[in-house]
């Protein structure tokens, strides 16, 4: 009966609310977010002294609040990550994982510092972040891939190794250049007047080691450093000759010549001798023949050249008596024809007969 009555009241909309019914008014989500933001600012930015009244003022500017609410979860995530890494580094960190943990901890600290600056700018009102800006782009500025850091560290190690090797090579090269070298001996003459009144000019020349004494006699008045002409032809070292001015006649300008070291004459190279073509030797071989070599020319020796130079410069010897060195032509040697060894001996080998073998036995 009560059920039918309730149904009629429901259809006729006559049902009244029960006196025991309790209704709860839910708060909007904005108030919850503002309280969470207030707790976050009180925890991390106490020095800013942001009050709830300030947050209500900020709530009028929806852009500032929205940006702060976007940064809030990211800031807490980086904060918890940094705290975990610091605890891991302080207690029980493995040696091979310490470099990676230190890098990640530094990255988290750098991101937290950047977020602190952003929050401060947003609260003060001197910074505005547009909706198009992405937080991922912001994180890319302060984060680096671990593989890239490892590659950079490896390259830096190679650069340091190359610097060490280069420094070692430079030091070794400098030590080699500073090593004492044996300088050539120097013969220096002193200018002055001898006891007999002879004027001597000051000369200096490079003296080559291991040279023989000069072949010029001292009676001629011509002196030369200790050096032989044979060594001059092979080694290009300058020499200066000293002479007595009294040997020259006064008024004879033709004989006044400057005595200088004789320049080495070019040596005439002999034509190469063709190799001997040997014929095959045998029983019926032909006689060996050698081709005639070119005529050999001999140059005057150093002693002869030096004597001729002295005779030219000496006033006591007439110039007509001095003969220039001539090339002496030596005829090629006459090589006789040579036959085989049997023909030279004049004995022919005979085969032993049977009768000779029996008689010898």
Swiss-Prot record:
A lipid is attached at residue 8 (S-palmitoyl cysteine). Transmembrane segments: none annotated. Keywords: Host cytoplasm, Host Golgi apparatus, Lipoprotein, Palmitate, Phosphoprotein, Virion, Virion tegument. InterPro entries: Herpes_U44. One of its GO terms (cellular component) is host cell Golgi apparatus. It comes from the Viruses. Residues 251-299 are annotated as: Disordered. Belongs to the herpesviridae UL51 family. This is Tegument protein UL51 homolog. The lineage of its organism: Viruses, Duplodnaviria, Heunggongvirae, Peploviricota, Herviviricetes.
